[in-house]
From Swiss-Prot:
Record's keyword terms, sorted: Aminoacyl-tRNA synthetase, ATP-binding, Cytoplasm, Ligase, Nucleotide-binding, Protein biosynthesis
GO molecular function annotations of the record: arginine-tRNA ligase activity; ATP binding
Keyword Protease part of the UniProt annotation: no
Motif ('HIGH' region): 120-130
Classification lineage: Archaea, Thermoproteota, Thermoprotei, Thermoproteales, Thermoproteaceae
Source organism (scientific name): Pyrobaculum aerophilum (strain ATCC 51768 / DSM 7523 / JCM 9630 / CIP 104966 / NBRC 100827 / IM2)
EC number of this enzyme: 6.1.1.19
Protein name, UniProt field: Arginine--tRNA ligase
Gene Ontology cellular component list: cytoplasm
Organism domain of life: Archaea
Gene coding for it: argS
Catalysed transformations (reactions): tRNA(Arg) + L-arginine + ATP = L-arginyl-tRNA(Arg) + AMP + diphosphate
NCBIfam families listed in its UniProt record: argS, PRK01611.3-3
Signal sequence range: none
């Protein structure tokens, strides 16, 4: 139920009458700008004379309307204000009938969706950047589910490639030590250190070989600086995992790790049982830790898709390379044994920029290594094709803007292979990075802030903050406040804008934070607990300004949900909830509810109930935990 449906229909009738009088070929669209009225319509494109528009509106403005309170003309805008008392009746009726589903409308239902998100490499813990991905993907899924759509969430387990092989090789060298260590620590944390150390040892070995061949003194000094940097990485890792890191350096230091990793990857991709056992053991350990972190955030994954199973062992990735070579030999080049597809020329020749929503610059794409093994993008094409064939209307892939070209290549190659409908199903839901002031991150060097560390600090800071108001706050409440604050911080900004993560903003009790919203919810909940049953609600003709604003704000909720779902923008929900909470808290400070006069007490309790209902629905969409005390 949408409380604004009937008022909007009444305004559309007015627009129809005005348009007929003016002899217009169509009725202007209704806009909700609230600039000069709650509803507006622009007559600019029809070249209407302003005085004639005003004259026509004057003829009908004094009619009796059920939901419109006034009509006015400003330039070539026709504006309408609403009868807020009538709207309040519609709002309360919708809230009582729909409860926590208030906000859902039939227009909100748009189809079925496969949402792939997080998909972190299984070599280290989820870090703060993965946090934004996971929370965005989870909230998109929640938003689409709230709207009645069929939604399935997927995590792509990238278990192929040299980096995963480094983790497996390092783990194999110190397996006994790692097993003891993970009895007390999360497995993804320990494997993350093992991976970074193995990578550092491999880089030191590679650079030493390069140093032997270097002839230029400047290049030699540059290589020595790089070696020193990687040695520093090992020393830093020893502070947390001394015995394990020392053994990795000792066991692997004299081996050609890069070539060994390439060979192990080749064996793994060919399905060698021994290689599968080594790699899967370490991958599953990391996934166990990543699952724990996601559960802590309230993120649920429906299906875990292993890259090896869906794209490599099925031979699907190699089939794609072979088919592309047969179909489009004129766009294929062989460079050093590697297969390259000239995606740039293909897009230009077939003018595909608008068809596939592509960036203007498209580089060529390498499909295989010189040894014939497939690369990430090739396997990703195979995975995208598999996703597109799962019976969903759209496939939403939550992947950072850093992969804009790779994701464009996926759609281009699908199109080139004749999978046109499948290519058009794929949506690259791009998002920008999360910046921590003073912190430069590199997973290969073991330099990152894990998502668990962020959540730990959020809980700790939340406990200190909330205990100032309520000394009896438990650790469970502090954890839920921390989770809410982190989720909101990652959702309140447009996905296309980078986030500067600052604790004073994340835990602001006065505005624009998950903590602020949770505090507002607790306030509304507390009032309703004391109020008891909500009986008949007579709506007063005269309301406080904040009451009028709250009624109209609550009435807008279904429209906000519909627009957020249509645009795939959970930040619209976050922005709306912050605005609602600001108005409600201002109202709370000015107007007594429980001790109000009997003539308005029921009305005010109904407003509080409506605010609480909207917050509950919004919290579900954003994944913010609800609290009854704080």
């Amino acid at each position: 139920m949408d409380p604004l449906r009937q008022p909007r229909e009444e305004f559309v009738k007015v627009l129809g009458e005005v348009s007929r009088e003016l002899g217009l070929p169509e009725v202007p669209e209704v806009e909700r700008t609230r600039r000069y009225g709650f509803f507006s319509a622009r007559f600019h494109k029809y070249k209407v004379d302003h005085s004639r528009l005003a004259e026509v509106v004057n003829l009908i403005k004094n009619k009796r309307f059920e939901f419109l309170s006034s009509l006015s003309v400003d330039g070539l805008y026709l504006n309408a204000d609403l009868n807020v008392s009538k709207v309040a009746e519609l709002v309360f009726e919708a809230v009582v009938k729909m409860g926590r589903k208030y906000g859902f409308t039939e227009e909100c239902v748009t189809g079925s969706y496969l949402v792939e998100h997080t998909s972190a490499n299984p070599v280290h813990p989820l870090h703060i950047g993965h946090g934004r991905n996971a929370i965005l993907g989870d909230s998109l899924a929640r938003l689409l589910k709230f709207c009645g759509n069929k939604v399935e969430t997927h995590f792509y387990v990238d278990d192929c490639g040299v980096q995963v092989m480094y983790a497996a090789m390092g783990y194999n060298a110190v397996k006994d030590e790692v097993k003891k260590r993970i009895e007390k620590s999360k497995p993804d944390v320990v494997i993350g250190h093992v991976y970074s150390a193995t990578n550092a040892v491999a880089e030191i070995g590679r650079l030493k070989k390069e140093l032997e061949k270097a002839q230029d003194d400047e290049r030699k000094r540059e290589i020595l600086r790089e070696i020193d940097e990687w040695v520093a990485v090992l020393k830093r890792l020893m502070d947390s995992e001394g015995d394990i890191i020392s053994k990795i350096a000792e066991e692997l230091g004299r081996r050609d790790l890069l070539n060994e990793a390439v060979e192990l990857n080749r064996r793994y991709e060919s399905g060698d049982p021994e290689a599968k056992g080594v790699v899967r053991e370490v991958v599953d350990l990391v996934l166990k830790g990543q699952r724990e972190t996601l559960a802590r955030l309230g993120v649920e994954i429906d299906k875990w898709d292993y890259e090896s199973e869906l794209t490599v062992w099925s031979s699907e990735a190699m089939r794609i390379v072979s088919e592309l070579q047969k179909r489009w030999p004129q766009y294929i080049e062989i460079k050093g044994g590697a297969v390259v597809f000239r995606a740039d020329k293909f897009v230009q020749d077939y003018n595909l920029w608008d068809v596939l929503d592509l960036p203007r610059f498209i580089p060529p794409v390498t499909l295989t290594r010189s040894d014939g093994t497939t690369l990430y993008v090739t396997r990703d094409v195979a995975y995208a094709l598999w996703q597109a064939r799962q019976g969903f209307d759209k496939v939403i892939r939550v992947i950072s803007t850093e992969q804009t070209h790779e994701q464009a290549h996926v759609r281009i190659i699908l199109y080139a292979l004749g999978y046109v409908d499948e290519a058009k199903k794929i949506v690259h839901y791009a998002y920008e990075m999360v910046n921590l002031p003073g912190m430069k991150m590199s997973a290969r060097r073991g330099q990152y802030i894990s998502l668990d560390e962020i959540l730990d600090e959020a809980a700790e800071r939340s406990a200190s903050l909330v205990k100032e108001k309520n000394p009896e706050v438990s650790g469970v409440i502090a954890e839920r406040v921390g989770v809410g604050s982190v989720r909101y911080a990652f959702l309140t900004t447009s996905p296309r804008k980078p986030i500067e993560f600052k604790w004073d903003v994340v835990l602001n009790l006065r505005q624009n934070s998950g903590t602020f919203l949770q505090y507002t919810y607790v306030r509304a909940y507390s009032i309703l607990e004391k109020a008891g049953e909500i009986g008949n609600v007579p709506v007063p003709e005269n309301m406080l300004a904040e009451e009028r604003e709250l009624v109209l704000k609550i009435a807008e909720w279904p429209s906000v949900v519909k627009e957020a779902a249509k645009s795939l923008r959970p930040d619209y929900v976050a922005e709306y909830l912050d605005g609602l909470a600001l108005v409600f808290n201002s109202y709370y400070e000015k107007a007594p509810v429980l001790k109000a006069e009997e003539s308005v007490r029921g009305f005010r309790i109904a407003i509080v109930n409506a605010v609480k209902t909207v917050l509950e629905a919004g919290f579900y969409i954003l994944g913010i935990p609800t609290l009854t005390k704080m």
